[in-house]
Amino acid sequence: MINPHLLDELTRRGLVAQNSDPVALADHLATPRTVYCGFDPTAGSLHIGHLVPLLMLRRFQLAGHTPVALVGGATGLIGDPSFKATERNLNSSETVQGWVASLSAQIKALLPASEGLAAPLLVNNADWMGQMSALDFLRDIGKHFSVNAMLVRESVRQRLARPDQGISFTEFSYALLQSQDYAVLNQRLGCTLQIGGNDQWGNITSGMDLTRRLHQAQVYGMTLPLITKADGTKFGKTEGGAIWLDPALTSPYAFYQFWLGTADEDVYRFLRYYSFMPLTEIEALEAEDAKRQGRKLAQQVLADELTELVHGKGALAAAQRISELLFSGEVARLGESDLAQLAQDGMPGWRIEGETDLVTLLVESGLANSKRIARELLAAGAISLNGEIRREEPLRAADRLFGRHLLLRRGKKQYRLVTWQG
């Protein structure tokens, strides 16, 4: 069943930055269409910057259209230079192939087949580019591109303006490769709409032009906004780096905490971008939060929605449990897998061998600058061990969680996860 109001809803959510022909595209989407978005493998996992375009494909699927996710097994060997200050490092074919496999698995999980909806398609542009010779590429694709027009593109001009960097022919040719993707998908799958980030507008319009030249097809392009925070800074990274979708790189607990930390100025906008909550429910939540004193509900809703979407109900429950137990101080109820998540997330740790006493441990782990200060902290009740205030120095075997862990805390926020080796 086609949703005739899809473009209007996407616009009201703030998800449309540029649209090649808003009126014609709205008419075009009145019947089932095929839409694609490309994802180049630049690492072994997608990160939250990929979520908005990936979820956009899901929105089109729910509206009655066929989504196509393209993983760039060929373009990933080159790297998109769009608005990059320096030349990308080239990765080996083996590395890129491994990344393609990882990203494909993540995309399948987030873009599932659903009863009554068009089945999502996953393609790899290495399947057609790998079979094309350089001569064929130059004759069949290159002849349709004007170097004059390519040189005035903003992303190219920025690089040419830097004599210390410039742009290689390899990266200069990237737009031709992405354009060929659109033409191939139009011919093979009937794809008539490409979506992508706002920095992809030049590549998308080039692909539209090539497709029209090669196949005389009417095709469209649409970009999504660059996601920034209210203060204008780029969204999606922390001091520790990117927020990955792979739980081995960013644990579900850290993922959950990231969304809980969303600023009040951003949270309702991010609910419109990242969640499938109806706009009326988001507006009602914002109105309810405006009446509340203290912490808003929206951050909790956002964290719950996104953690369950990416990691599942079980991981959400674990993240909620860890958060609750750390906040309440009932850390003795943490499971060993919970402690492993905390260690993965970068909770400061300390590994020791053999026996020690609490004063020495406080100093060696960095929670106290000297043994005198350590004893003063203990006497003042400022040190907790596994969630309980500790005033005594001796450590007992029974203090160890699962026989090998201690969770020390000084004050409210300074934690050390101590682990006995062996």
From Swiss-Prot:
Keywords: Aminoacyl-tRNA synthetase, ATP-binding, Cytoplasm, Ligase, Nucleotide-binding, Protein biosynthesis, RNA-binding. SUPFAM superfamilies: Alpha-L RNA-binding motif, Nucleotidylyl transferase. Its main location: cytoplasm. GO terms for molecular function: ATP binding; RNA binding; tyrosine-tRNA ligase activity. A motif ('KMSKS' region) lies at residues 234-238. Pfam families: SYY_C-terminal, tRNA-synt_1b. Its EC number is 6.1.1.1. The keyword Protein biosynthesis applies. L-tyrosine binds at Y36, Y174, Q178. Residues 356-420 form the S4 RNA-binding domain. InterPro entries: aa-tRNA-synth_I_CS, aa-tRNA-synth_Ic, Rossmann-like_a/b/a_fold, S4_RNA-bd_sf, SYY-like_C, Tyr-tRNA-ligase, Tyr-tRNA-ligase_bac-type, Tyr-tRNA-ligase_bac_1. Belongs to the class-I aminoacyl-tRNA synthetase family. TyrS type 1 subfamily. Homodimer. PANTHER family: TYROSINE--TRNA LIGASE, MITOCHONDRIAL (PTHR11766:SF0), TYROSYL-TRNA SYNTHETASE (PTHR11766). Catalyzes the attachment of tyrosine to tRNA(Tyr) in a two-step reaction: tyrosine is first activated by ATP to form Tyr-AMP and then transferred to the acceptor end of tRNA(Tyr). This is Tyrosine--tRNA ligase.
